[in-house]
């Protein structure tokens, strides 16, 4: 697991190496570490291991939207397993640190993204805020909780991307308050075409630790699903709104 030394003084990143120079009392201290890149398969394996993701084509789940789905994702479960929690936190930090090095602060999406955003901000030593789905109906009526200054570059942390609608609404709230949205990182994405189109239209780069294709491939390798079930799972992803099982 890498150790982060955060400095605006000097920073170089490439595929597998990070070099950071920290200036302290006229002396330069240089740190090196080497690591593998974000492992989508390893993240998917851990989510399956703790049943954070369940696959059941025979008895589909019903989402809040009314969609029938052969998959259910509950990334909140990872918070209850310390070693997996640390792994996911570090992977989030790696993505943010490498892909969005200019971010001034992080913003968590309420509610599931709040914990992950706070943990990543703590490890990266960045300021942190979180965004509610709507303004509070009492007190100060805040929709964004925490201190921020307009013009700052903010990275949004989310746990799950389905259609992307609610996640992008958060980006809109941040932009309306004068913040620059650098991008969004999520633990898992279903990879729906509608989500890809929405993020592209909004001009918000999206990164995820793992995705639907990786998950299905891994489930097939492990014998969790068979070839017939794989076809069902892939067909659902093509047209989830009209899929009936």
Features from the language model and the residues they span:
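Short hydrophobic targeting helices and cationic amphipathic motifs
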Residues: 5-7, 11, 24-25, 34
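Short, glycine/charge-rich flexible loops or terminal/linker lids adjacent to PRPP-binding catalytic cores
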Residues: 117-155, 163-169
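Active-site-facing substrate-recognition patch
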Residues: 38-99
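PRPP-dependent phosphoribosyltransferase catalytic core
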Residues: 38-49, 172-245
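Short glycine-rich phosphate-binding loop at a beta-alpha junction
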Residues: 102-110, 185
């Amino acid at each position: 697991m890498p150790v982060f030394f955060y400095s605006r003084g000097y920073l170089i990143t490439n595929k597998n190496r990070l070099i950071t120079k920290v200036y302290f009392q006229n002396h330069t201290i240089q740190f090196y570490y080497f690591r593998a890149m974000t492992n989508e398969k390893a993240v998917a394996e851990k989510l399956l291991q703790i049943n954070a993701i369940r696959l059941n084509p025979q008895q589909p789940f019903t989402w809040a939207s009314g969609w029938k789905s052969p998959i259910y994702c509950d990334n909140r479960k990872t918070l209850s397993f310390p070693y997996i929690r640390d792994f996911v936190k570090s992977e989030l930090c790696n993505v943010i640190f490498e892909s969005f090095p200019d971010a001034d602060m992080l913003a968590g999406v309420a509610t599931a993204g709040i914990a992950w955003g706070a943990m990543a901000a703590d490890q990266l030593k960045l300021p942190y805020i979180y965004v509610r789905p709507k303004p509070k109906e009492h007190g100060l009526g805040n929709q964004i909780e925490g201190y921020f200054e307009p013009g700052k570059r903010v990275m949004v942390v989310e746990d799950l991307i389905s259609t992307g609608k609610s996640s992008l609404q958060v980006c809109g709230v941040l932009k309306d308050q004068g913040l620059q949205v650098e991008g969004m990182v999520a633990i898992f994405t279903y990879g729906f075409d509608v989500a890809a189109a929405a993020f592209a239209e909004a001009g918000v780069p999206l990164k995820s630790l793992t995705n639907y294709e990786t998950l299905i491939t891994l489930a097939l390798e492990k014998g969790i699903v068979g070839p017939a079930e794989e076809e069902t799972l892939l067909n659902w992803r093509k047209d989830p709104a009209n899929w009936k099982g």
